[in-house]
A protein has these predicted regions:
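An intracellular "coupling" helix at the cytosolic face of ABC transporter transmembrane type-1 domains
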Residues: 109-110, 126-135, 139, 143, ...
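A hydrophobic transmembrane-helix motif
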Residues: 43, 73-76, 139-182, 234-281
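Cytosolic ends of transmembrane helices, especially the final helix of ABC transmembrane type-1 domains
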Residues: 218, 242, 259, 289-317
Length: 578
């Protein structure tokens, strides 16, 4: 049932290319027709050669010329058919991969957080490639195989129904074997695909975090974990390949029986004058052409099981429930005044395990709101909710008096300038990374933003300055420099609201002071949310919210909270040893 559903989903993609499909089928039929006509010419030539009397070489020459033209035309027709099949396959693969990527872009972060990056990448790259190989083989060999079987059967019935009966009686054994193995291998290939995805995930983790792996001496344990998955993949692959490898020898054995039966029956018929030597030659050629597609189709069926198993995993991604759609009348947030309110907000990552309960917060335009507290208290979660990376379970969040669920996500998020604890840089130049939020920025604006964030100095010292290429992880740059680039992005856009999540945690104290000066200028008149463990970065905040277990337990500015001598004062003293 699941395979049928997968096939129906696939057919929806193929329908767009119905014209190419018809063209492919027409040239497949033409290729088969010309291929099947060739044995008749060969049989006629054999009869001319073995006939009593003088051999008519002129007639044989004409037959040979016909054969040459026919072979050339068959090759051309097959080339056009393959070209059509290639176009159908790779356009379909392009569409599926585009849909998978488009769905990935609108999936809730809950899905991304629940799956390893490598596993998602494996579905979109390795699984799609495997699917493409199976689909191409299916188009290339399945059409011609079926047409060849039908065509040769008709020709053999026309030539000698009795000998054809021998072929038809023995052949179903081959179909039974192929069908049995196909049912067995589908589940095995799906298991193999899943193990391959898990292995890709481990490699992605290890390559991306190799410094941490080596720093903690995790190499042996990482190797053990990889070997365990690698061994599981080997076993899955062996089981799948073992069963699939039985197909070809089994069908070849049955086909040999067919060929032997035709030889015996044909020889007996020729002895009694029921068939000429040339006709027997043609019949043997047809018998060979009739059985050959069964070998190919059995291989195609096995490959298709792998392709369908991979397609099933791809369609699982494409059909994942997307994030809550925006209402049809969603408003675009333009020129917000900076007021933000969280009203009776409750949220949980895991159902019935509340992280934040009945949370209230009111930020006035231009206020600097600092959020502090121990790890896991919900600080970063508040930021996720403000940006609507996650939706609240109950309550609501308002920006400028508007419920953010009634706003377009794009307009909401571009209203915030965000610097995260984990820096992210894309493959490209320094300049391309800075202008991500403002692609039309001038060189003067870029340099001004870099100077304001104190990034201009180190950028100028790079080999090609702002045109220096970097990799996605910012290879060659220090963690502090990478974070400075991320801060420069925000400096360039000058959004009405700011979110700074551990924004200076990777920068030395001297640079941090300069950054704080730049941020003070940037935050002037802008509502700012600052999440930090380093309390030195939030002394100038208008309001400091002290969180614990998803609740605000203290609230005030730096001085009043110290005077209260509560949890904040305890945190402050622990950091500054006073």
């Amino acid at each position: 049932m699941k395979k049928k559903n997968t096939m129906r989903k696939l057919l929806r993609y193929l329908k767009k290319y119905w014209l190419l499909l018809i063209l492919s089928l027409l040239f497949a039929a033409l290729t088969v027709a010309m291929t099947l006509y060739l044995p008749i010419l060969i049989g006629q030539a054999v009869d001319l050669i073995v006939a009593p009397g003088q051999v008519e070489f002129s007639t044989i020459a004409r037959l040979l010329l016909k054969m040459g033209i026919l072979i050339g035309a068959t090759a051309l027709s097959q080339w056009i058919m393959n070209a059509c099949n290639n176009r159908i396959t790779y356009r379909t693969v392009r569409d599926i991969r585009s849909d998978a990527f488009a769905r990935l872009e609108i999936l809730p972060l809950r899905y991304i957080d629940a799956h390893s990056y490598g596993e998602i990448v494996s579905r979109m790259i390795a699984d799609v490639d495997q699917f493409a190989d199976g689909l191409l083989m299916g188009f290339t060999q399945f059409f011609t195989g079926v047409l060849t079987i039908v065509g040769t059967l008709l020709f053999m019935l026309w030539m000698n129904p009795l000998i054809t009966l021998v072929v038809v009686v023995i052949t179903p054994v081959s179909l039974f074997v192929a069908s049995f193995i196909a049912r067995k291998t589908y589940a095995m290939f799906k298991e193999q695909s899943a193990a391959r995805g898990e292995q890709t995930g481990i490699i992605d983790e290890m390559v991306g975090n190799q410094k941490v792996v080596q720093a903690f001496g995790y190499q042996d344990r990482a190797q053990g974990r990889f070997d365990e998955v690698n061994e599981r993949l080997r076993k899955c692959s062996l089981r799948a390949i073992f069963f699939s490898s039985i197909t070809n020898p089994s069908t070849r054995f049955v086909n040999s029986l067919v060929y032997a039966g035709v030889c015996v029956a044909g020889a007996l018929s020729a002895v009694h004058g029921g068939i000429s030597v040339g006709q027997l030659t043609s019949f043997l050629s047809y018998a060979n052409q009739y059985t050959k597609p069964f070998n190919e189709i059995s291989g195609v069926v096995t490959e298709l099981q792998n392709a369908l198993a991979c397609a099933d995993r791809i369609f699982e991604l494409i059909e994942e429930t997307p994030q809550t759609p925006e209402p049809a009348d969603a408003k675009t947030l333009t020129d917000p005044d900076g007021s933000v309110a969280l009203e009776d907000v409750s949220f949980s990552y895991v159902p019935e395990q509340h992280l934040i309960e009945h949370f209230d917060l009111a930020a006035k335009p231009g206020q600097r709101i600092a959020i502090v507290g121990p790890t896991g208290c919900g600080k970063t979660t508040i930021i996720n909710l403000l940006m609507r990376f996650y939706d609240v379970d109950s309550g609501c969040i308002r920006v400028g008096g508007e419920d953010i669920r009634q706003l377009t996500r794009g307009s909401l998020r571009t209203s915030y300038g965000m610097v995260l604890q984990d820096t992210w840089l894309k493959t490209g130049t320094i300049r391309e990374n800075i202008v991500m939020g403002k692609p039309d920025a001038t060189d003067e604006e870029i340099i001004a933003a870099a100077k304001a964030s104190h990034a201009h100095g180190f950028i100028r010292r790079l080999p090609q300055g702002y045109n220096t290429p970097i990799t996605e992880d910012g290879g060659g740059l220090s963690q502090g420099q990478k974070q400075l680039l991320c801060i420069t992005r925000v400096m360039l856009c000058l959004p009405p609201m700011l979110i700074l999540d551990e924004a200076t945690s990777s920068i030395d104290t001297r640079t941090e002071i300069k950054i704080q000066e730049a941020f003070n200028r940037l935050m002037q008149g802008r509502t700012s949310f600052i999440v930090a463990h380093r309390l030195s970065t939030i002394r100038e905040a208008d309001v400091i919210l002290v969180m614990k277990d998803g609740h605000i337990i203290e609230q005030g500015n730096h001085r009043t909270l110290l005077e209260k001598n509560g949890f904040y004062a305890e945190l402050y003293r622990s950091q500054f040893d006073i």
